[in-house]
Structures are given as C-alpha cells and as structure tokens.
Amino acid sequence: MVLLAQGACCSNQWLAAVLLSLCSCLPAGQSVDFPWAAVDNMLVRKGDTAVLRCYLEDGASKGAWLNRSSIIFAGGDKWSVDPRVSISTLNKRDYSLQIQNVDVTDDGPYTCSVQTQHTPRTMQVHLTVQVPPKIYDISNDMTINEGTNVTLTCLATGKPEPAISWRHISPSAKPFENGQYLDIYGITRDQAGEYECSAENDVSFPDVKKVRVVVNFAPTIQEIKSGTVTPGRSGLIRCEGAGVPPPAFEWYKGEKRLFNGQQGIIIQNFSTRSILTVTNVTQEHFGNYTCVAANKLGTTNASLPLNPPSTAQYGITGSACDLFSCWSLALTLSSVISIFYLKNAILQ
C-alpha cells in the first residue's frame, strides 16, 4: 500500500493513499458505498458524451473520481488507461468527469470525493447508458401452403428493453398484439403479404424490418365469358383465374385440346387470365369450350358454349317470307280502309 501511494504525485499522495486503503478493503467488483453521499441518476444514450458534474470548494481543495472500486482520477493524476475519460477544466472549481462515446460497459455508479478542511465530501452519480432498439434476428421470407400454421419471430436488443409489435402492411395494414412471436393458425390467401416488425424503446427511432409471406393455394376460375360471335369475324373467350403459384391455362373444345395457331386459334396466357381468340369464325368453331387452370396444388375448370348469333333480332321471330307476308297484308288492309273512308266522304 505504501509503495502504491509513493507512485502518485506528491500533492496527491494523501488522497491516493486514502482511496487505495478504502478500495483494498472491498471484495473484487464491489463498489464504494458512501452512505452520506447524495445520489444523482444520469441517462445518456450510447455513443454520446457523458459529463458527471463535481465541484471543488476552492482551487486548493483536492478531488478524486472512482468507478465502483477502481480509481479513475486522483487529483490531477489519471489512473485510468481509457483514452475516452478526462477531467473538465472549465474553471478552477470544476472537477467534472467527462466520458466520450459512452458504451454499455460504462454503465454503473461513479463517486466524486472532495477533500475539505474537516471531512471528505462525496457525490454519487449512477450512469445509465441507454441503447437504441436493434432487431438482430427476424424470420426469413417464406412460402407456405394455405392452411399451414405459421410463427414469425422478431428478436431485438436495447436499453430499456424494446417493445416489439407486428403489423400486416399489405394488403390490409392490420395491427397485431405486441410480442416477439406472431402466430398465425391456418393461414389463408388473404393473409399473404408483408409483415412489419417494429422494435421501440423511446431512445431513438424504432427499428423496423419486414418479412414477406407467400401463401400457395389451388387455382380458382373466377369468370369465363365471351362477346358476340359473328361468322366471318373474330371472336374471343376470356377466362379469369387466380392461384399461387400462377396457374397454367389450357383450352379444350369438347374433349379435344386446342393449341395456339391451330385452325385460326390464338391463345394468350397471362398470370391471372387466358384469352382464346378465333380469327375467322366458321360453323366449325361453334360448340362447348372449356378453360382449365392448374398448378402444383390442384386443377379446376369452367365451360362456356360458343353459339351462333340468333337470326331473329330485335324481338322479331319467323322467316323472311313470313315477314314479307305480314307487310303485304298490312298494305292491303291499309288500302281497303282508305277506299272505305273515301267512299263515305263522297256520299256525304
């Protein structure tokens, strides 16, 4: 103990000796406890500079800083090897401890002891280093089948411990309860999309990450229809479907499969629809057409008859000869009525 005290500057030998004797009585890792000292709490964000305030009574008094049982400064002598630590020298009375780029390892109690004429005056500061939220583990993007149970995981660090929340951001933007794990039982196609995990603790902006969930489901045909079909002109049938993965479409006329370019037929397949076009409609093209949609989860189909246009339009039925006869009869009756009215007029 005497050898250690002799290693300090002469002006600070007494202070170093007192501190060393005090610290040597403590078990390793235990902090110095001054029951008469006032305790102040300081919150500092990780990466910022912490200034722990302490003032001497006059320019001649001596001070010291301790962190737990370790001496940081004794008077003007620096005992710590940490280059981030220094004493503020704004004026002769200022003996504040400055720690640059604070980290979580700097968290804990600090004690400033000032030697007065009678007894040491001490002040304690408990430094709490706050850490912004950081998501360090989140579920990978996934592709699963409809009806499967799914658990999404989002783990984050921070001080205070961040609150974690989930949100289905597409397509419904539905919020969920807070928690590291989001359980979805029997997932449906409507629950596909992006899920956003947000970690927040008010130290900084929330940390946000996303998981994309693709839900496979068997295809469905939502609509099949055609426009007016006239011989000698083009006609088309449109088949609207849905499925994940996108379904492959096929066309049949009766039991016979149709191919693109066959007998004036053009087939255009897209992710959610297929269009069958007949470039020059003839009598052979009329009949029953079936659209088939298939992916690895299933197959479905829908049919539509392609019929020739009705020869009786605008509500008129019957043959052309019948129509001519009706017009002849109408003209004859009209002539008879006209002659009758003319005769009566002459007689009068």
Swiss-Prot record:
Q: Which SMART domains does this one have?
A: IG, IGc2
Q: Where would I find the Ig-like C2-type domain in this sequence?
A: 32-128, 133-215, 219-307
- Describe tissue expression: Highly expressed in brain.
Per the record, membrane topology reads: Lipid-anchor; GPI-anchor
Listed under GO cellular component are: apical dendrite; dendrite; dendritic shaft; dendritic spine; neuronal cell body; plasma membrane; postsynaptic density; side of membrane
Q: Where is the lipid attached (GPI-anchor amidated glycine)?
A: G318
- The signal peptide here is 1-31
- One of the Pfam families matching this protein, by short name: I-set
List of residues that carry Phosphotyrosine: Y181
Q: How is it modified post-translationally?
A: Glycosylated.
**Record localization:** Cell membrane
Which positions are cleaved off as the propeptide during maturation?
A: 319-348
Q: Which UniProt keywords apply?
A: Cell adhesion, Cell membrane, Disulfide bond, Glycoprotein, GPI-anchor, Immunoglobulin domain, Lipoprotein, Membrane, Phosphoprotein, Repeat, Signal
Predominant localisation class = membrane
GO BP terms, alphabetized: brain development; cell-cell adhesion; cholesterol homeostasis; fat cell differentiation; feeding behavior; lipid droplet formation; locomotory behavior; negative regulation of glial cell proliferation
Q: Gene3D superfamilies given for it?
A: Immunoglobulins
Disulfide pairs here are C54-C112, C154-C197, C239-C291
Q: Which domain of life is it from?
A: Eukaryota
Record: glycosylation sites: N67, N149, N269, N280, N288, N301
What role is this protein assigned?
May be involved in cell-adhesion. May function as a trans-neural growth-promoting factor in regenerative axon sprouting in the mammalian brain.
Protein family per UniProt: Belongs to the immunoglobulin superfamily. IgLON family.
State the PANTHER family in the record: IGLON FAMILY OF IMMUNOGLOBULIN SUPERFAMILY-RELATED, NEURONAL GROWTH REGULATOR 1
Q: What is this protein called?
A: Neuronal growth regulator 1
Please name the gene that encodes this protein: Negr1
